[in-house]
Amino acid sequence: MEQLKIDLNLGRSQQHDFIYPLIFQEYIYALAHDRGLNRSIFLENAGYDNKFSLLIVKRLITHLITQMYQQNHFLFSVNDSNQKKILGYNTNLYSQMIFEGFAVVVEIPFYLRLLSFLEGKERMKSHNLRSIHSIFPFLEDKFAFLNYVLDIQIPHPIHLEIFIQTLRYWVKDASSLHLLRFFLHEYPIWNSFLIRKKSSFSFSKRNQRFFFFLYNFHVCEYESIFVFLRNQSFHLRSISYETFLERISFYRKIELEEVFTKDFKAILWVFKEPFLHYVRYRGNALLASKGTSLLMNKWKHYIVNFWQCYFYIWSQPRRIDINQLSNHSLDFLGYLSSVRLKHLMVRSQMIENSFLIENASKKFDTLMPITPMIGSLSKAKFCNVLGHPMSKPAWSALSDSDIIERFGRIYRNLSHYYSGSLKKRNLYRIKYILRLSCARTLARKHKSTVRAFLKRLGMGLLEEFFTEEEQVFYLTLPKASSTSGELYRRRVWYLDIICINHMSNYE
């Protein structure tokens, strides 16, 4: 790490050949290797042993560059998919390590620019803003007063060259970009990195960091348009908007303002909208406004044209849906969110006369969708497609305590994440499925009936399915059912959830 600090001084950040020499430094790959082991992203999960040689990595990179200049095939023929060795070494392991090293090296210019930008400036630093649940209080405060929302699926680039062309405006090191381009094009299992799921894409577990970096950079370039819009609209010049925007952007977006102003000045009037709010998670984004349907249609066509003209991405208009918040539920971050009218009758009395006043207010609701959740449980073999609990034969070889702990942890994860649901009835059903599935798994293991096993186990099975809040009410107020009921009518957002991992992959 000390050697890295010596080499990464700000004075060299402007040199064109800054990144290229770092590709041959062994400590870069040692850093990537150690970070990967700590995060359990590769090597351990991929089934490789922990034997690793920095010298082999350096030889492979030298071999790569030699083949690149000779215009020969780099590793092996694309048609020869069964070959597993590079110069006698493990293909998957060392190719993966080269990608991880590239990820560390390419991130360096962005990190240095970030330090330079933040120097002498105060920025709100809060770990709570990393939580997925931090989005929902924002939606509660803003979306209840809006009319329409654009449900956007950000298109995935279908060609590697789009990644490289976008990256070249940031990384001025031509040698490194040529090496990166050659490696990506010659790597024979590029398609295995992208797993197509219906209308979206996701990354496989191998080389996640590097391709997440490329994809997130690409998405941030998409979002550069919103900096331009904020600077052009007086109503969007708010500290809160700027703070949240800077959390999801690279700071070069500010430099794009002049380009957008020059090319889109004629249609700038479309965006003079004081109530404009944008949130994104992964490839899904929501853009809400208080404007009319006509305004949202203009937004839709503008975004599609912007993607096609500046990023050469063919985006089908059906990937952007226009929905009215008052009669549509948003499927976002695992919740079904909607805006509904809440009617309140107030009795008013003046001297001898009394009358009723009806007040209507909008309220932002979040519910747990039961059908997709039962589908996930069915896929994991906890129940059938109708939601009837089943035993888990794969866990029958475990000890009783491990089986109960696994089922209980899955429920606690679900309960923790869906604590923001206004109605907990669906969560009760999930709890019932997991508890009965746990009981049937234990009964199957001991060759007994569910009734007999539950009678023998007693409350021991139930305790693992209590959340921390439920345990407090159960131990202190066991008879206060009304007080306990208040717990299930509350909506709680936790600010420690940084990823969605309901099922706790034990397979």
From Swiss-Prot:
The keyword Plastid belongs to this UniProt entry's keyword annotation: yes
Localization of this protein: Plastid, Chloroplast
UniProt signal peptide: none
PANTHER family in the cross-refs: MATURASE K (PTHR34811:SF1)
The keyword Ribonucleoprotein is annotated on this UniProt entry: no
Physiological role: Usually encoded in the trnK tRNA gene intron. Probably assists in splicing its own and other chloroplast group II introns.
CC terms in the record's Gene Ontology section: chloroplast
Biological process annotations from GO: mRNA processing; RNA splicing; tRNA processing
InterPro entries, sorted: Domain_X (IPR024937), Maturase_MatK (IPR002866), Maturase_MatK_N (IPR024942)
Listed GO MF terms: RNA binding
A Pfam family annotated for this UniProt entry: Intron_maturas2
Protein family per UniProt: Belongs to the intron maturase 2 family. MatK subfamily.
Protein name per the record: Maturase K
Organism: Kalmia procumbens (Alpine azalea)
Keywords carried by this UniProt record: Chloroplast, mRNA processing, Plastid, RNA-binding, tRNA processing
